[in-house]
């Protein structure tokens, strides 16, 4: 039977006898864990033991697995060297079944509290600058038997069950800020307002959010505007918008951006109450004139 005392005894024996490991570089993560207070936060995430294994150590293994494991769905456990467990204070590697049990017992509220606290500590330590925030979403194919709406999977180019992830990232440091995971069928309009609220709680300062075309929704942009969040995103390509850009008089392309002519005008978006700034680049490629448009609610931003 595995108990905390038996784990500690076996761990001390392994350390006394010495070991070699391809994962020894992971020990350089120890100061980072101490800075962030990873042990304390994992204690609050799931205080109960999982089969006698301290949840803090199991949580550390999951974190390290994201660094050393393979991406995507795995059929076999590719980490078999027992010394890998020593990074998490364990004399062995917990099985995928144990990891899944760990995830299944974590309440969603605890997960969000963990991410909020982690984000706030990163901000305090200077790992997040919080000036420009990348906002994006991805669908990860799910093989769950649960009935759920289907989402479009861009990689596979099919509609299927998926886990919808919505996240924010600090553009300057490339560090993650917050993440939400939802079932298939969850749209950006449903998930992003709360995602922005959590990001604001972490950063504690106004920021500009860079988004993709999926966020081109008037009601969503209106909600973000009410929260005081500045956004910039590419204009959706449509015949209507192309004609609108082509109709801009040449005299309005008075500015330059990376050697390309730029017009700073205004446009309207359905379900958004006010005019939006419309930044239009005029590009000459392959003897053709092309237009690239961006919209923003930031009236003070310098193109």
PLM regions with names:
Residues 1-159, 165-185, 189-197, 201, ...:
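Dynamic "connector" segments at or just before major functional cores
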Residues 136, 179-181, 210-212, 232-234, ...:
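Generic beta-strand/beta-sheet core signal
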Residues 131, 207-209, 231:
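Generic beta-sheet signal
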Residues 222, 227-303:
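An anionic, glycine-rich sequence signature occurring as long contiguous blocks
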Residues 209-218, 237-240:
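Acidic, metal-coordinating catalytic cores used for nucleic-acid/nucleotide bond scission
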Residues 186, 214-215, 300:
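Short, surface-exposed acidic/glycine-rich loop or hinge patches that mediate macromolecular interfaces
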Residues 153-155, 197, 219-221, 280-282:
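Generic recognition of flexible, low-complexity loop/linker segments
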Residues 203-205:
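Short helix-loop-beta connector
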């Amino acid at each position: 039977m595995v108990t905390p005392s038996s784990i500690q005894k076996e761990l001390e024996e392994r350390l006394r006898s010495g070991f070699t490991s391809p994962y020894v570089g992971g020990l350089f993560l120890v100061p980072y864990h101490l800075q962030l207070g990873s042990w304390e936060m994992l204690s609050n995430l799931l205080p109960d033991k999982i089969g006698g294994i301290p949840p803090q150590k199991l949580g550390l293994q999951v974190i390290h697995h994201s660094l050393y494991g393979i991406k995507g769905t795995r059929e076999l456990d590719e980490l078999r060297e027992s010394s890998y467990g020593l990074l998490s204070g364990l004399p062995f590697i917990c099985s995928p079944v144990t990891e899944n049990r760990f995830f299944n017992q974590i309440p969603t509220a605890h997960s969000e509290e963990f991410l909020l606290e982690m984000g706030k500590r990163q901000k305090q330590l200077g790992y997040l600058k919080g000036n420009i925030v990348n906002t994006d979403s991805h669908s990860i194919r799910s093989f769950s038997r649960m009935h759920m709406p289907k989402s479009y999977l861009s990689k596979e180019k099919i509609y299927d069950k998926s886990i919808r992830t919505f996240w924010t990232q600090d553009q300057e440091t490339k560090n993650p800020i917050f993440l939400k995971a939802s079932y298939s069928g969850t749209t950006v309009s449903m998930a992003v307002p709360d995602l922005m609220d959590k990001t604001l709680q972490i950063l504690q300062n106004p920021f500009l959010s860079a988004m993709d075309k999926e966020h081109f929704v008037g009601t969503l942009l209106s909600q973000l505007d009410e929260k005081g969040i500045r956004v910039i995103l590419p204009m959706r390509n449509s015949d209507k918008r192309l004609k609108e850009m082509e109709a801009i008089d040449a005299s309005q392309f008075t500015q330059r951006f990376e050697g390309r002519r730029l017009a700073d005008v205004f446009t309207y978006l359905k379900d958004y109450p006010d005019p939006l700034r419309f930044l239009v680049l005029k590009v000459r490629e392959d003897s053709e004139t092309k237009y690239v448009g961006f919209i923003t609610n930031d009236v003070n931003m310098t193109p």
